[in-house]
Amino acid sequence: MTVRIAINGFGRIGRNVVRALYESGRRAEITVVAINELADAAGMAHLLKYDTSHGRFAWEVRHEREQLFVGDDVIRILHERTLADLPWRELGVDVVLDCTGVYGNREHGEAHIAAGAKKVLFSHPGSNDLDATVVFGVNQNQLRAEHRIVSNASCTTNCIIPVIKLLDDAYGIESGTVTTIHSAMNDQQVIDAYHSDLRRTRAASQSIIPVDTKLAAGITRIFPQFNDRFEAIAVRVPTINVTAIDLSVTVKKTVKASEVNQLLQKAAQGAFHGIVDYTESPLVSIDFNHDPHSAIVDGTQTRVSGAHLIKTLVWCDNEWGFANRMLDTTLAMAAVGFRLDASASTKL
């Protein structure tokens, strides 16, 4: 069965989802039938074709009126502001990928369902009343047909959760701290300008800027046993893509850095292949641009202090890796089937 998807919001993640779909050769599994975006069709086509981070799209892209052509495929373009008025029923949409970054609670998800979609996947952390939050590679096997409104968590949650799971399963994590070193985002300023967050009033290209993060909450959403045992901070740096995460955990068992690296490398080659990668090459952030993994462990930076404190550095392409996980989770949601008569009876 080919899953019919619609994309709501054609920004960084929405466009990368389309690019990843075509570049990964999954068009036999997923078809994009519509994109809802307030911008005009000419701008949508141009930004899909030309991308500063990811280069020129290999597929032919053009638009005619309210249709976007990617190769021989035709995608309907919509400019609807009201979710309930979207024509998902008419278009036979199976899953809406809501990539706006604006919507994320159950009411928003139910609006997509009322418009005719069978399921909804948010490209960002959602409210607690959603049916499930999925980090693909860790908990997607717990999805059920009744999970209709789902969050794909965040790019940083997808990056760090697999590594936390591996370390916890092997050594038993007592507590941890996380520092996210994140590329600049579109909620920052090109030059100094007003923003409700005074730090984000400053030019993104000229400073390392501390910002708030809910990553600790994202960790406990997936692993409730770590409630009040993880803290996180984040800074934005003057690059346009790729993120590094500094993870420090205190563990119950004694361990050596070489053992940690052996564990993570084995996982990258085995159970977490395609989700986690491992490198000991002397690489920098640009080298991970367009990498489809959720997490790339930099084994050269692993440290152990006092036999119980582990520090690791984990990279991710916060756009491309996450866009690929959106596709993975979409297929996982479709694989368990569609239950149309009721909302979820059990939460994940």
UniProtKB/Swiss-Prot annotation:
One of its GO terms (biological process) is glucose metabolic process. Its EC number is 1.2.1.72. NAD(+) binds at residues 12-13, 81, 318. The record marks 182 as: Activates thiol group during catalysis. PROSITE patterns: GAPDH. Keywords: Cytoplasm, NAD, Oxidoreductase, Pyridoxine biosynthesis. InterPro entries: E4P_DH_bac, GlycerAld/Erythrose_P_DH, GlycerAld_3-P_DH_AS, GlycerAld_3-P_DH_cat, GlycerAld_3-P_DH_NAD(P)-bd, Glyceraldehyde-3-P_DH_1, NAD(P)-bd_dom_sf. GO terms for molecular function: erythrose-4-phosphate dehydrogenase activity; NAD binding; NADP binding. Substrate binds at residues 154-156, 200, 213-214, 236. The keyword Protein transport does not apply. The keyword NAD applies. It is an enzyme of class 1 (oxidoreductase). It catalyses: D-erythrose 4-phosphate + NAD(+) + H2O = 4-phospho-D-erythronate + NADH + 2 H(+). GO terms for cellular component: cytoplasm. The active site is at residue 155. It holds the Pfam family Gp_dh_N. Pathway: Cofactor biosynthesis; pyridoxine 5'-phosphate biosynthesis; pyridoxine 5'-phosphate from D-erythrose 4-phosphate: step 1/5. It is found in: Cytoplasm. Catalyzes the NAD-dependent conversion of D-erythrose 4-phosphate to 4-phosphoerythronate. Belongs to the glyceraldehyde-3-phosphate dehydrogenase family. Epd subfamily. Homotetramer. This is D-erythrose-4-phosphate dehydrogenase. It comes from Salmonella paratyphi B (strain ATCC BAA-1250 / SPB7). The gene is epd.
